Amino acid sequence: MNKSLKIWIPLIVTYLIFFAWYTNLSGPLTEQEIETYKKIFEESNSARRDSGQWEKAFKFMSEDDGKDFYMVNFLDRNESPRTMEATGEGATSLDLQMHYMEYMWPQQFKRASHPVFFAFVLNPALDIVATQGMEDWDIVAIFRYRSRRDLFEIGLNPIFDERHEYKVEALDKTIAIPVETPFITDLRLAL
């Protein structure tokens, strides 16, 4: 085997493994999967069960195109969170958020989902229309998800509900908006 092949074959194999991990090869959610997720959610003891937001989430499921997407998060931290069991007395909002992320990081990474952008906000919103109380944010974070299936597998795990309470207490308000993935930022093409 010549020297060039000894270099290229491992590189190609590594890229193919990365591509298979990073790409949703399962296609869009099927009706059966959606019904299974709905059943899991309805049978759960989740505090989120009565939230009208779940109708929007199920609509998001049913419109699945099988592609990856970004979740844009605006976070306003709670400066005086109540005491929570796992983080103890005197825990800051960051402590609570990190307890939540201890579950999220490994769940996201094993599904080729990861942070894309994270920054502290410099100033209150400079342009805001038709809403009150949305001027102030502390953090903007963008996460890439390989698929909607991955998002719902993470979010419907019973451990998620336990940890999600910590995220809720860590924040005064938050908005999470799914958006299309910009083509130019796709790591499969950058590599």
Regions found by a protein language model. Give the residues of each.
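Active-site scaffold segments
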Residues: I139-R144
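Short S/T/G/P-rich N-terminal loop/turn motif that feeds into the first structured element of a domain
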Residues: N2-W137, E180-L191
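An acidic-aromatic pocket/loop used at catalytic or ligand-binding sites
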Residues: R146, D150, R188-L191
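Short amphipathic alpha-helices within nucleic acid-binding modules
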Residues: T83-M84, S147-L156, F160
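Catalytic cores of eukaryotic secretory-pathway lumenal/extracellular enzymes that build
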Residues: L171-D172, A176
